[in-house]
Design a protein with these regions (language model features):
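Juxtamembrane helix-loop-helix connectors linking adjacent transmembrane helices
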Residues: 76-114
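Active-site alpha-helix of zinc metalloproteases
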Residues: 111, 115, 119, 214
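Juxtamembrane/interfacial segments flanking transmembrane helices
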Residues: 85-91, 118-135, 196-204
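Interfacial transmembrane-helix boundary/kink motif in multi-pass membrane proteins
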Residues: 48-70, 93-104
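Membrane-helix interface/capping segments
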Residues: 42-51, 80-92, 128
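Cytosolic/stromal cytosol-facing helical appendages immediately following the last transmembrane segment
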Residues: 1-26, 30, 38-41, 46-56, ...
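Hydrophobic alpha-helical transmembrane segments of multi-pass membrane proteins
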Residues: 18-19, 105, 109, 121-122, ...
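Hydrophobic alpha-helical transmembrane segments of multi-pass integral membrane proteins
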Residues: 23-36, 67-83, 109-112, 162-167
Length: 258
C-alpha cells in the first residue's frame, strides 16, 4: 500500500491546521488566564475553588504539554481531512443543501452526547492502574488546574482525546463546518472545566437542568482527588454509573457561598 494512503504530510497545510487549533486555544485559554490569574487575580481569589494558586512551573508544564497536544491534534486531523486518499471515505460533506439546515443544527446535540460518552469511558479506562501512568498521569499532575491544563496531555492521551475526531469523521454525515464549530464549543467548555473558578450560579447544581451538567467544581474535584467525576459536558454517566462524588453538592455550595 502506498504510504500516502495511510499518511499524508504537507507542511503548509499542517501549519494552517495547527495555527487554527493553537490560535483558538491560546486566545481562549490565554484570555481567560489573563483575566482570572493576572489582571483581576486579587479581586477574585477569595472565590477560587482551591484557595491556592498553581506555581509558575505548573503553568509552564501545562503550556508545554498543550503545545505538544496541538501538534498531535494537527497531524491526526490533517491525515483525515487533508489526505486525498482518506477524505473521500469520510462522512464529511461540503454542501449544506445535501442534508438541509434542520439536519445541520440537529447534529450538534448528537455530537455532544457522543463526545461526552466517548470521553467518560476512555477517561475511566485511562484511570486503570495498568495504564494510568502511561496515558493520564501527566494531566493529573495538575492537581490544582489552570486553564492551560485543558490540553495538557501526554502524547499518548492526546491521541486518545483526538480519537473523537476520527469517530465523527466516519460515523455519520457532518458538514465540514460542524466540526470546527463543535470543537470551538468543546475547548470553551474544557477551559471552563479547568478554570479554577465556578461560573454557574448558586443552586445550579441542584436545578432540573444543572444536576445533569458538569461544572468547574465537579471537574476540579476530579483533579484534586483523582477518583470520581469522570464526565466532560454532562453528569449523566457519572450519575448512572455511581461515580459522582458524594461530596460534590457540598463542595459546589461551599464555593458559591463565599
Amino acid at each position: 500500500m502506498p504510504i500516502q494512503l495511510i499518511f499524508s504530510f504537507n507542511f503548509n497545510k499542517y501549519f494552517q491546521v495547527i495555527s487554527s487549533i493553537g490560535g483558538r486555544y491560546i486566545l481562549i485559554a490565554g484570555g481567560v488566564f489573563l483575566f482570572f490569574y493576572v489582571v483581576f487575580k486579587n479581586k477574585v481569589l477569595a472565590k477560587k475553588i482551591q484557595n491556592a494558586l498553581p506555581k509558575n512551573k505548573d503553568y509552564l508544564r501545562e503550556f508545554v504539554y498543550s503545545i505538544s497536544t496541538i501538534l498531535i491534534f494537527g497531524l491526526i486531523i490533517l491525515n483525515i481531512i487533508g489526505n486525498p486518499a482518506v477524505r473521500p471515505h469520510t462522512k464529511i460533506y461540503d454542501d449544506i443543501a445535501e442534508y438541509g439546515w434542520l439536519y445541520y443544527f440537529a447534529v450538534f446535540p448528537v455530537m455532544l452526547i457522543i463526545h461526552d460518552t466517548y470521553f467518560y469511558w476512555t477517561h475511566r479506562i485511562m484511570h486503570h492502574k495498568s495504564i494510568f501512568k502511561i496515558f493520564h498521569l501527566v494531566h493529573h499532575q495538575s492537581t490544582n488546574p489552570s486553564p492551560w491544563a485543558a490540553y495538557a496531555f501526554h502524547p499518548m492521551e492526546a491521541i486518545v482525546e483526538n480519537g473523537i475526531f476520527i469517530v465523527f469523521a466516519f460515523l455519520f454525515p457532518l458538514h465540514k463546518s460542524n466540526l470546527p464549530i463543535f470543537f470551538l464549543f468543546s475547548i470553551l467548555y474544557n477551559v471552563y472545566g479547568h478554570l479554577g473558578w465556578e461560573l454557574y450560579p448558586k443552586g445550579f447544581n441542584k436545578s432540573i437542568v444543572g444536576k445533569w451538567v458538569n461544572t468547574s467544581v465537579c471537574h476540579n474535584q476530579h483533579h484534586k482527588y483523582f477518583k470520581g467525576n469522570y464526565g466532560l459536558y454532562l453528569l449523566f454517566w457519572d450519575r448512572l454509573m455511581g461515580t459522582l462524588r458524594n461530596d460534590y453538592d457540598i463542595a459546589f455550595e461551599e464555593v458559591k457561598s463565599r
